[in-house]
C-alpha cells in the first residue's frame, strides 16, 4: 500500500547564473542523421531526444579534442544547453554523456524534460549509480539561469528515512517513470535512495513547484509520497 508522507515546506533559491551565449556555428545534419554544430575541436553534437518542442534548443556534447571517439572514450566531455539556430552555448550542464551515432557512453544517460513553451528544461544526467546532475534551466534570450534540484530534493528524501539508514545511499532520478514539467513550473518525477548492488531501494513520487522572479529561479517541494520500488 502506498503511504503518503507529510513534507515540510522546503524552499531553495539560488542566485541566477546568467551566462551570455557563446556563439559556435550553424548546426547541420551528419551522416547518421544527427545534428553537429561547428567543426574540429569546437564541434558539438546534439543529443538524441533532447530537442525542445519549439525546435530552437537542445542538449549537446563536445570533447576536448572534438567529436572523434575511440578506445578509450573521448577525454574532457562536456554536456551543454545550446540554441540550434546558431550553435550558441547557453549553459554548461552537469553530465558527461556522449554519443556519435555509432557509439555512446556506457551506463550514462542524458534526459531532457521541456516545458511546453520551450523556455524551461529539466536535466537528468545519470551515471551507473547516481544522478550526477538534476537541474532546472530557465532560458531568457541569450542567457540561461540554473537551479540545482538535487540539492533541494535529496535532503528531504533522506530525512524521511530512519536515522540508521541515512548513510551510504545513492540518489537517482528514475527515467523509466514519468518526468514532466508543465507551463506553470510544476515538476513531477520519481526518485530513489538506494544502496548500490543491493535490493534496498526507497522510491518516492515527488512534486516540486518552480518559479522565476527577476531572473532568479527558486523551488519548493510540495509533496512526496513513498511508492513501491520495481
What are these regions (language model features)?
Residues 24-51, 133, 141-230:
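Acidic, small-residue rich beta-repeat scaffolds with periodic aromatic anchors
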Residues 61-65, 71-72, 123-128, 190-194:
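Beta-strand C-termini and the immediately following turn/loop, strongest in propeller blades
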Residues 71-77, 127-132, 199-203:
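Short, solvent-exposed loop/turn segments at conserved positions within beta-propeller repeat blades
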Residues 116-117:
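Residue-level detector of Asp-centered blade-edge/turn motifs that repeat once per structural unit
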Residues 1-4:
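Positively charged n-region of N-terminal signal peptides that target proteins for export
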Residues 14-21:
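C-terminal segment of classical bacterial N-terminal signal peptides
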Residues 47-113:
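Short N-terminal edge-element motif at the start of the domain
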